[in-house]
Every structure is written in C-alpha cells, then in structure tokens.
Amino acid sequence: MEDKLKGLYAALLVPFDEHGQVKEEGLKQIAKNAIETEKLDGLYVNGSSGENFLISKEQKKQIFRVVKETVGDDVNLIAQIGSLDLNEAIELGKYATELGYDALSAVTPFYYPFSFEEIKQYYFDIIEATQNNMIIYAIPDLTGVNISIEQFGELFNHEKVVGVKYTAPNFFLLERIRKAFPNKLILSGFDEMLVQATISGVDGAIGSTYNVNGRRARQIFDLAREGKIAEAYQIQHDTNDIIETVLSMGIYPTLKEILKSRGIDGGLPKRPFRPFDESHRDALDTLIKKYDL
C-alpha cells in the first residue's frame, strides 16, 4: 500500500459560490486539471487547502463524492477526515472508505491541550472503526501539536498507520523519522521546501500550489531524486518566487484566480476569507504570463 501511495498530490482546492455552497462543476474541473494538466499522481481531498475547517460535514461528504465520481479508480485519493468531533471523523472516514478512497488522513486534534495518549487513541479509534489505512497529518504551526520521534514510533507501531503528511520546517526531525522508519510513507507538505524534503528522503509531496504549478513540482522532485540538486534548486527558486507572490495576494483566492485564467470555475474562498483583491490584478496577470501558469 505504501508504494502505491507514493508520488505528488494536489491539496485540492474547492470552489464556493457567494453563499458558501460547493460549486460541483468547478470542483470537477479543478480535479481534472490537477491530474490531466498538472500531471499529478493523486489528490489529497478536504485538507487545509480545501478550507475544510470552514465547511459542514455534509459539504465534506459532497466533496468526497464528487471528486471520486470525477476521477474514478485510476488516481490515488487520500481523504482528510480529521475533526475535533471524533464521531464526525469516524463517520467521514467510513464514508470515504465506502467510496473507495485509498487511505485516510487526519489532522492531529487541536485547540484543546490534548495529551499524546489522547491523540494516539483518536487515531486508533478511527482506524478501528474504518479499517482503512491512516496517514498522520502533522502540521504543528497550525495545530500547536509537536509529535516527537518516540511518539511517531508509537503511532507507527500500528500496522495501519502507514505514514505521515509532514508539514513542518524541522528537517532534523524529518531525517530522524526517515532513518527510523524506512518503510513508512512520508509526504512533504511544504511546497516551498520540496528540494530539501526530497533530499531528506520523502516519498512524495502534497501541495496547494500544485493545483497550478504541479509540473514544476514534478521537475524538482525528479531532479532532486536523480542527484541534480543545482538544477532542482533553479526550478525551486522560480517556484518560490511564485509562492511568495501568491502568498502576498492571499493564497486561496489567488490560486482560484489562476485557475479561472485557464477557463476553470475556481469559485470564491469560503467566508470569512475575502475574495481576490482586484488591486492585485495586474500583478497577477504578470505572474501568470511570466511563469506560464
């Protein structure tokens, strides 16, 4: 299973209308774009880039369903089902598993200061209820939850905890995880550090900017794995120029505007996120043209 899940994934964007409802046709277009145009291996569905923590349980199910119906069985699909409500996480996990998602992923429980034993049991309860494989979603900058190498060991002792989506800048810990658990899947979550992560031995990556810049990510990943580090860095420099500009304009509305430039209905971000600021339009047009986005 771990080998099947290796590769590059779009952290899938989700288009909303002005009332905060999912635009299904736009979602289908975004999913197809990631696979057919950006040439990615799979989709990570209902993660941070899908504005997951701003939407209802029924919307999450709707997104899981539409994406699966759109791409079928030929694309790797990972369902992010993490929720502070364990019952909801289990319900979503069962639903995604029934749809045929290849693995589940769940962000570490956050906001409340949960103990590691509580966090570990949360994952094991989801696995027990769904009988699907689990990829830990470690994003300490947003959750405040730091998992130590010893704690990763306790999680990885469960045969169905197959890996981690590692969205953290601690490359010492990443190296330690890679050395200690050579058979576990590690997917990098920082688009701007793909060269460094690949050198550190990750099996793939999941990125929000891969929705529009996946082809460069593929070049970086392949070159770094071939040991062509200087060449990989040159493309990473361009990628980071793109990322820096996109972040300055607001990541989700800006990525959706880039999709719109391709004739894709990128929709709006979910409130309270603001829509794209039109004062950035000329700069965005320049970015799209310069980097052929």
Swiss-Prot record:
Active-site residues, record numbering mapped to chain: 137, 165
Positions that bind aceneuramate: 48-49, 167, 189, 191-192, 208
Class of this enzyme: lyase
InterPro entries: Aldolase_TIM, DapA-like, NanA, Schiff_base-form_aldolases_AS
Pathway(s) of this molecule: Amino-sugar metabolism; N-acetylneuraminate degradation; D-fructose 6-phosphate from N-acetylneuraminate: step 1/5
Subcellular location: Cytoplasm
SMART domains registered for this protein in UniProt: DHDPS
Keyword annotations of the record: Carbohydrate metabolism, Cytoplasm, Lyase, Schiff base
Record's subunit section: Homotetramer.
Protein name: N-acetylneuraminate lyase
Organism of derivation: Staphylococcus haemolyticus (strain JCSC1435)
